[in-house]
Curated annotation (Swiss-Prot):
Subunit structure: Heptamer of 7 subunits arranged in a ring. Interacts with the chaperonin GroEL.
Any Pfam family the entry gives: Cpn10
Listed name of the protein: Co-chaperonin GroES
Xref: SMART domains: Cpn10
SUPFAM superfamilies with a match to the protein in the record: GroES-like
Species for this entry: Renibacterium salmoninarum (strain ATCC 33209 / DSM 20767 / JCM 11484 / NBRC 15589 / NCIMB 2235)
Similarity remark: Belongs to the GroES chaperonin family.
Amino acid sequence: MSVSIKPLEDRIVVRQLDAEQTTASGLVIPDSAKEKPQEGEVVAVGPGRVDDNGNRVPVDVAVGDVVLYSKYGGTEVKTGGEELLVLSARDVLAIVVK
């Protein structure tokens, strides 16, 4: 799917990955008790911020990366029937390597 959002500067667009639906013992977690997801797949990346010298500083993540991000970071947006999250690069905590 192509994303119709083009992030600016050091922002990235993330598709949130679903949180675990059941516990290790097999109990189903109701929607009201689920934690906000903190993992997602990068679907678009801005060109990077401009530093004090006018140089473009690229973002450390790329499209397709799975990232961990701050629990309450970013702005939720809906486009094309899909819910996405627009984050600043500083809200990304790590890239998940599998």
